[in-house]
Amino acid sequence: MRWFYSTNHKDIGTLYFILGVWAGMVGAGMSLLIRIELSQPGAFLGSDQLYNTIVTAHXFVMIFFLVMPVFIGGFGNWLLPLMLGAPDMAFPRLNNMSFWLLPPSLILLVSSAAVEKGAGTGWTVYPPLASNLAHAGPSVDLAIFSLHLAGASSILGAINFITTVINMRWSGLRLERIPLFVWAVLITVVLLLLSLPVLAGAITMLLTDRNLNTSFFDPAGGGDPILYQHLFWFFGHPEVYILILPGFGAISHIVSHYTAKLEPFGALGMIYAMLGIAVLGFIVWAHHMFTVGLDVDTRAYFTAVTMIIAVPTGIKVFSWLATIHGSKIKYETPVLWALGFIFLFTTGGLTGIILSNSSLDIILHDTYYVVAHFHYVLSMGAVFAIFAAFTHWFPLLTGLTLHHRWANAQFFLMFLGVNTTFFPQHFLGLSGMPRRYSDYPDAFMKWNVVSSFGSLLSFVALMLFIFILWEAFASQRSVISSPHMSSALEWSDPILPLDFHNLSETGIITYPK
């Protein structure tokens, strides 16, 4: 029962991890179904609607039930109080509620796919396809309610994290000195707090359009489906930065830890870069809508500002490289993930720069080029960062160590798998293969076969990861000590795993005058 009503940040963080791992398996299973369908021309599932329902559910599960719970809920809950020297989160019971809103939300999402014909709208849920005309029945409504719950969970969590960071720091721990992961999560939850209400408004209007005969998005009643797209992407674009920013913070910690440095190169610049990304992230949303007939000045503006986001992102990438430069790096598993992250995230960023050109995007929009782009930054950005953070902080969370050689092998297998899956999709997109179709002309077969083979490699790597987890718990190799630098506050308690309540009183940090 302790897990149900726990108000302890470590317990709740662990619950988020369990939910995230489980949902990650579900989402990975869906992605395998997608790749099996596309592994050869002709039908496998036999229905485009079913295929699109799987695509929709895959996306929602991976975004709202894997990346966000693990990074913000799992690592955020576990590490923020430790890095700030706080005894717990500011609102422990609210924290508990934030977690317990997620399982019902996940159940609603799975139900939406299971009842009637499912929500085959894609994760963007655009009307008129999502209207009661094209999607009669309760499926889309269930998906909307699922999003409402997940959004409420995130907003409550955001309030909690913001309050914790502002009020519960060690005396003397000035804002510019708090660790980069704390900054990353703080900026992330501010983005959540500002963008989720807009999504809630959009999907509530969609709900009333579907059930109460309003016409927010129906031209017949004076509405406009483009309004929905503007509202959705005003949330959707900050959302993709919400997914990656905690990863930035984690990678900063890992890179400086394994290069034996007290802090990453240009730590203050890193904070400003994240702030810059956060601000710019709110004013570029229409680059997802270059094909809907925006006028030329609007397209020019969104192209230009989207390209400007590359500047703070580039600052971060080069600062990580500068941190690594000249150091005697210890090639342990988290470093491999971090280096893989830097390389592949940069690749995804470059395809993003290409897509930010409105003229090119009109050709590439809704092709597999876009799929390849965002899977490079998510599947090899956010997910690699999760693996890096998990392998790095696993001894802190459990007091146990992972099997070194197997963890390394799992990285190389996963690296091979995701690249084999997603690199060929750039070629498919450039040849004009569209997204969200369950079948394709024979001309596209070669690269689809390669891509589907890569997905099997990734799946084996995932199973190997689950085995490595089991092996670590089964073997019980305890941590003796941590080789951390004095600036890494979360490791400062000498006894691992950390006690249920590790801080009986808060500390004080003094500075030389």
Curated annotation (Swiss-Prot):
Cu cation binds at residues 237, 287-288. One of its GO terms (cellular component) is respiratory chain complex IV. It catalyses: 4 Fe(II)-[cytochrome c] + O2 + 8 H(+)(in) = 4 Fe(III)-[cytochrome c] + 2 H2O + 4 H(+)(out). There is a cross-link at residues 237-241 (1'-histidyl-3'-tyrosine (His-Tyr)). Mg(2+) binds at residues 365-366. Its cofactor is heme; Cu cation. InterPro entries: Cyt_c_oxase-like_su1_dom, Cyt_c_oxase-like_su1_sf, Cyt_C_Oxase_1, Cyt_c_Oxase_su1_BS, Cyt_c_oxase_su1_dom. Component of the cytochrome c oxidase (complex IV, CIV), a multisubunit enzyme composed of a catalytic core of 3 subunits and several supernumerary subunits. The complex exists as a monomer or a dimer and forms supercomplexes (SCs) in the inner mitochondrial membrane with ubiquinol-cytochrome c oxidoreductase (cytochrome b-c1 complex, complex III, CIII). This is Cytochrome c oxidase subunit 1. It comes from Lumbricus terrestris. The lineage of its organism: Eukaryota, Metazoa, Spiralia, Lophotrochozoa, Annelida.
